[in-house]
Amino acid sequence: MAKLLVLHGPNLNLLGTREPEVYGHTTLADIDQALAAQASTAGHAVESLQSNAEHVLVDRVQAARNDGTAFILINPAAFTHTSVALRDALAAVAVPFIEIHLSNPHTREPFRQHSYFSDKAVGVVCGFGADSYRYAMDAALARVRVAGA
């Protein structure tokens, strides 16, 4: 059984009510519940954490190095375009990760079109709403099976 970590960045606690025309009506609790079921069906465990505080996410990424986390799925949200600290933490722990976005940042404002994470990620899944998480989990589960975790 592998342990997967799902990290949600700032404002994602407002999913379902914040700009539903951009982010949809699915709540973060709905997403976390679906991911836990998806991983459990495959025989794996998921831990999810949402924080509006950069240091909380950095601390959790650093802890992943020693707690048996096999894979990280992260929606850095607004930190996508600003957080060198979170990027450096992900690079330092060397746990593979997938970057996730509900919307497609490449079709949005210019400042949203650059990611500090994409070049370090195994892959990026964006633009499919809440399904972006499901697709990313599919990819992560395939990779932990291949790795024998």
From Swiss-Prot:
Enzyme Commission no: 4.2.1.10
Keyword entries, A-Z: Amino-acid biosynthesis, Aromatic amino acid biosynthesis, Lyase
Lipid metabolism in keyword set: no
Site feature Transition state stabilizer, where: R18
Reactions it catalyzes: 3-dehydroquinate = 3-dehydroshikimate + H2O
Entry annotation: catalytic residues: Y23 (proton acceptor), H101 (proton donor)
Binding site for substrate: N75, H81, D88, L102, S103, R112
Function noted in UniProt: Catalyzes a trans-dehydration via an enolate intermediate.
Designated name of the protein: 3-dehydroquinate dehydratase
Organism per entry: Stenotrophomonas maltophilia (strain R551-3)
